[in-house]
Amino acid sequence: KYNVNDALDVTNGEIKIIRAVGNPEIKTITSNMVSGFDSSKENTKLPLTVSYTENGETKTTKYDVSIKDTVTAVSMKNTPKTEYKYNEAIDVSTGTISVTKGSGTKDIAITENMVSGYDPTKLGKQTITITYGGKTTSYEVNVKDYVTGISITPNAITGTYNDELEALINGNDIIYTVTYAKAGATSPRALTESMVAGYNKTSLTDQNSTVTYTDQDTNSYTNGKTFTTNLSVKLKNEISKVTITKPTK
């Protein structure tokens, strides 16, 4: 068996010389005895002729070889996506590998059926193996948990005209909870005034203030992204003072 563009190899090849008289003789085949070898293209059954000349007389015998354009090596050309969120399918659409065969080297696109070793439910670094033509190369990916949203409790409160936001938050013990795709809900934390926008202490109409949370978890896929929910606020117009004008009588 030969690869495309391989040189002829007659190592361990022998012929048996049978003469009219005497015992048979074993001769080592040399490359100059062989004709018909052409490894420039594939051939499943290429006949080679072995010629032996003695005393001006030449005898021949034949054997067959196969020529196949076989993969000898693969290497990563363009690494595909390496950062994934929990339970995300692998994406190799931007990846290419360099494939070396007997005929030369060319770049081909990575397809999903070449990939092994990926588990979208396992957080952390993983080694991904690419297999092509019996040869392999690999690269590393990182699967991270991610924030799916936030919630606040309570999410609707009442107050009095001109109440400060901080007083409303503290007086109602408002907490917020961050939920991750895999880890689930985290321990509740106290809401801070800086997280709330859109509150007007002098408005008596129903208000929907926006609560914003920025993911600062460096191990999270959504690190740096913001998530919002609404805080419903209703201020009452309570009597703050009564004055009197005395009757004239």
What are these regions (language model features)?
Residues 1-23, 72-105, 148-185, 238-249:
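Solvent-exposed, low-complexity, repeat-rich "mucin-like" stalks and linkers
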Residues 22-67, 81-82, 103-139, 182-228, ...:
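Serine/threonine-rich, repeat-prone extracellular segments and beta-strand-based repeat modules
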Residues 64-73, 141-149, 231-240:
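Short domain-boundary/entry signatures in modular proteins, especially
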